[in-house]
């Protein structure tokens, strides 16, 4: 019953790397970020508006997090999200944290979302601060404390393939050691 949690900064490559780990291991992917985006769309809000709304409505985060916990308890899943690893750590075999420079992350978000670099810089910085405040007030979690992670990877100067390879190498080695058999 393998459980892998991938967390990290906005634009660090969480979803891309989690998706690839899930594909290689043949496991389903549960993305808190995608659930959050879907909730925002259903409420007719853009992503930043919804983050601000969630800051005063903690039930939103708790709803997403309870789904992550439920899936982690069931096992055989890759979970992805900014806070996911902190939430599912008791059930996770491997927790990976991805980070990158603000400029790199903004460039990725601009490319992904079709925004100007200036807008993406502002949005990424704002999202990060909103997340930090929200998680501290709701859960008492300091997202700058990375001590719970098995692997912390700076993706600033890595290609997607290199970041995926490093993450998979670590994950496969760790799981094989834990389960005393080859996992991937």
Curated annotation (Swiss-Prot):
InterPro entries: Cyt_kin_arch, Cytidylate_kinase_dom, P-loop_NTPase
Enzyme class: transferase
Transmembrane regions listed in the UniProt entry: none
GO biological process, one term: pyrimidine nucleotide metabolic process
Location, primary (coarse class): cytoplasm
Subcellular location: Cytoplasm
Keyword field: ATP-binding, Cytoplasm, Kinase, Nucleotide-binding, Transferase
Isomerase listed as a keyword: no
Catalytic activity of the protein: CMP + ATP = CDP + ADP; dCMP + ATP = dCDP + ADP
HAMAP family hit by this protein: Cytidyl_kinase_type2
Protein name: Cytidylate kinase
């Amino acid at each position: 019953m393998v459980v892998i949690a991938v967390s990290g900064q906005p634009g660090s490559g969480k979803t891309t790397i989690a998706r690839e780990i899930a594909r290689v291991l043949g496991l389903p992917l549960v993305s808190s970020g995608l659930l959050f985006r879907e909730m925002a769309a259903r409420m007719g809000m853009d992503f930043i508006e919804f983050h601000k709304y969630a800051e005063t409505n903690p039930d939103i985060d708790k709803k997403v997090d309870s789904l992550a916990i439920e899936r982690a308890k069931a096992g055989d899943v890759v979970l992805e999200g900014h806070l996911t690893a902190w939430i599912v750590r008791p059930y996770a075999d491997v927790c990976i944290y991805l980070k990158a420079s603000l400029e790199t992350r903004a460039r990725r978000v601009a490319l992904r979302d079709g925004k100007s670099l200036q807008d993406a810089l502002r949005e990424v910085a704002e999202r990060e601060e909103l997340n930090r405040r929200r998680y501290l007030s709701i859960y008492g979690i300091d997202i700058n404390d990375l001590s719970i992670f098995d692997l912390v990877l700076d993706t600033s100067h890595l290609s997607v393939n290199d970041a995926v390879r490093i993450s998979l190498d670590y994950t496969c080695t760790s799981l094989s050691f834990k389960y005393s058999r080859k996992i991937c």
